[in-house]
Amino acid sequence: MGIRKPALSVGEARRLAAARPEMVQAHLPVATQNSALPQPPENPDQEDRRPAPAVAKRHPSADRQSMLTVDALSSTTAPEKIQVFLSARPPAPQVSKIYDNLILQYSPSKSLQMILRRALGDFEKMLADGSFRTAPKSYPIPQTASEKSIIVQTSRMFPVPLLEVARNHFDPLGLETARAFGHKLATAALASFFAGEKTTKR
């Protein structure tokens, strides 16, 4: 059997061996060559994007509570009031059963003051709803000299709007003095109270 002659000479084999690493390096996948390089972000805007700082959330319920509180306070603000000086005389006997019973325990002045306080409170409501226009303005008073001398004087803070209604009714021309107006107002309040007392009995 004859000896085969190598297909490559020694020199060609050395050149091939030297060129093989370059060929291997040249055929490496692109992904392998670039794996060591830093990858740029897919979106350039993401590079500078940082999470926004947390902002403390306000509780809407607390804000609503404060608004409701402010509204409640403003809605309950008391109207402006002005002091009115009042005077009245005791009723004649049998005009008011309540008064006749009170004078058995208290003086006529004290008894009338107790009733007048209640009567003025009721009369304010009548001024507000307009029912005072059809109410009586006076009541019988005692005719004896000793009883005629009795007069009760007091004062009361009246809401300005209601006071204007009373002035237009009892002093439409604006000519009455303050005390004369106060006497008319107190007398009308007592007259309405005494009339209501009789209606209740029925």
UniProtKB/Swiss-Prot annotation:
Gene3D superfamilies: VirC2, RHH domain. It comes from the Bacteria. Residues 24-65 are annotated as: Disordered. Coiled coil: none annotated. GO terms for biological process: regulation of DNA-templated transcription. Keywords: Crown gall tumor, Plasmid. Disulfide bonds: none annotated. NCBIfam families: PRK13862.1. This is Protein virC2.
